[in-house]
């Protein structure tokens, strides 16, 4: 997983034909008489997200803002809770347990949709798409969808989501924080103190998670109770860092974590 930019999450081709159980490319209109060579659709600079982030985002058609940063194409991973075929599209309901399911519409021509079998309810899929809000309800316009063959993809998506949105936060802070002149010694002292404090918090959070005997791992609620002198924000920042670095991983939900050691 690269930390150099969002392009590392995307840059894949979505030019394959559509079928019920394989990678699928959306086609809004069919050409009945003349077949033309259509350019390949490229999915680049894809930002991994969870459903809650999409539903709480600010829409600026055809892009949207997450944490104040304009984002175009996104990916989500979740389980199909519903699949309905309409006259020219298939509507999936994708649930990743972070919010209510989001509708993801995959468009076809009227003739082609008759030949396509929707993916099965209950399977885990990865969806690449663009957020839309045509009637006031946010939904995804699917660019590509495929069934997860390895559940490690689910874990990788969670880690990429955490990393990507930490980068979004940093980008937002870098554009809003005013530059205040300080002496080099003040910069060094402040940096050393901040770094030491962050390391202490991370070490304490990791120790408590590592010592937890429960199968589901340590919850954020339990960490808050044991580290009552720390803010919730500081604890969650430590958890985000430890997750990205691979020291801990989420278990039953995004509130419980276990040590990877």
Curated annotation (Swiss-Prot):
Self-association and partners: Component of the aRPA, the alternative replication protein A complex, a trimeric complex similar to the replication protein A complex/RPA but where RPA1 and RPA3 are associated with RPA4 instead of RPA2. Interacts with RPA1 and RPA3.
Lineage: Eukaryota, Metazoa, Chordata, Craniata, Vertebrata
Gene3D superfamilies: Nucleic acid-binding proteins, Winged helix-like DNA-binding domain superfamily/Winged helix DNA-binding domain
GO biological process: DNA damage checkpoint signaling; DNA repair; DNA replication; DNA replication initiation; double-strand break repair via homologous recombination; nucleotide-excision repair
Subcellular location field: Nucleus
Keyword DNA damage: yes
Function as written in the Swiss-Prot or TrEMBL entry: As part of the alternative replication protein A complex, aRPA, binds single-stranded DNA and probably plays a role in DNA repair. Compared to the RPA2-containing, canonical RPA complex, may not support chromosomal DNA replication and cell cycle progression through S-phase. The aRPA may not promote efficient priming by DNA polymerase alpha but could support DNA polymerase delta synthesis in the presence of PCNA and replication factor C (RFC), the dual incision/excision reaction of nucleotide excision repair and RAD51-dependent strand exchange.
Family the UniProt entry places it in: Belongs to the replication factor A protein 2 family.
DNA-binding region: 74-148
InterPro entries: NA-bd_OB-fold (IPR012340), RFA2-like (IPR040260), Rfa2/RPA32 (IPR014646), RPA_C (IPR014892), WH-like_DNA-bd_sf (IPR036388), WH_DNA-bd_sf (IPR036390)
Gene for this chain: RPA4
Keyword terms, alphabetized: DNA damage, DNA repair, DNA-binding, Nucleus
GO cellular component: chromosome, telomeric region; DNA replication factor A complex; nucleoplasm; nucleus; site of double-strand break
Region (Disordered): 175-194
GO terms, molecular function: single-stranded DNA binding; telomeric DNA binding
Tissues where the protein occurs: Preferentially expressed in placental and colon mucosa. Widely expressed at intermediate or lower levels.
Protein name: Replication protein A 30 kDa subunit
Low complexity composition bias: residue spans: 177-187
Record bears the keyword DNA repair: yes
């Amino acid at each position: 997983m690269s930390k150099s930019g969002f392009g590392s999450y995307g840059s894949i081709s979505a030019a394959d034909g559509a079928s019920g159980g394989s990678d699928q490319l959306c086609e809004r209109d069919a050409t009945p008489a003349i077949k033309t060579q259509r350019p390949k659709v490229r999915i680049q600079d894809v930002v991994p997200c969870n459903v809650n982030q999409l539903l709480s985002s600010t829409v600026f058609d055809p892009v949207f803002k997450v944490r104040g940063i304009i984002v175009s194409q996104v990916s989500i991973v979740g389980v199909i809770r519903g699949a309905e075929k309409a006259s020219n599209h298939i509507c999936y309901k994708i649930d990743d347990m972070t919010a209510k399911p989001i509708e993801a519409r995959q468009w076809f021509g009227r003739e082609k949709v008759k030949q396509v079998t929707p993916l099965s309810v209950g399977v885990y899929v990865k969806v690449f798409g663009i957020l839309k809000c045509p009637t006031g309800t946010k939904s995804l316009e699917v660019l590509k969808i495929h069934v997860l063959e390895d559940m490690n993809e689910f874990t990788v998506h969670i880690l990429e989501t955490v990393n990507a949105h930490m980068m979004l936060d940093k980008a937002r802070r870098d554009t809003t924080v005013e530059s205040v002149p300080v002496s080099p010694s003040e910069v060094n002292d402040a940096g050393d103190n901040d770094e030491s404090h962050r390391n202490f918090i991370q070490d304490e959070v990791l120790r408590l998670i590592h010592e937890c005997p429960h199968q589901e791992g340590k919850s954020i609620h339990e960490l808050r109770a044991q580290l009552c002198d720390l803010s919730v924000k500081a604890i969650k920042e430590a958890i985000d860092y430890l997750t990205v670095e691979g020291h801990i991983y989420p278990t039953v939900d995004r509130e419980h974590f276990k040590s990877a050691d």
